[in-house]
Amino acid sequence: MGDVAAKLKIMPESVDTDLVGLKENLKNVIPAGAQLHGDIVEEPIAFGLKALIVTLIVNDEEGGTEPAEEAFAKVSGVENVQVLEAYRI
């Protein structure tokens, strides 16, 4: 099996969410078998709201990004998590 690069979009609960703190909290819950690739990037959405874009390297096995998605969704301040892209590397 190989590895997969997955790009996830994390939407904060509101414009007032502390993105610096949220980034740190997301880094702290990355599950075993996944690693952060690059920095967590802020992407402007609208009216001051910014999404966080996280790129992870995960194993190419069943349920590859699900542990990370579930861990990120449980972080305080996260509204939702969406996989934008996933491709084999």
Swiss-Prot record:
It comes from the Archaea. GO terms for molecular function: translation elongation factor activity. InterPro entries: eEF-1beta-like_sf, EF1B_bsu/dsu_GNE, Transl_elong_EF1B/ribsomal_bS6, Transl_elong_EF1B_B_arc. It holds the Pfam family EF1_GNE. Keywords: Elongation factor, Protein biosynthesis. Signal peptide: none annotated. SUPFAM superfamilies: eEF-1beta-like (SSF54984). Promotes the exchange of GDP for GTP in EF-1-alpha/GDP, thus allowing the regeneration of EF-1-alpha/GTP that could then be used to form the ternary complex EF-1-alpha/GTP/AAtRNA. Belongs to the EF-1-beta/EF-1-delta family. This is Elongation factor 1-beta. The gene is ef1b.
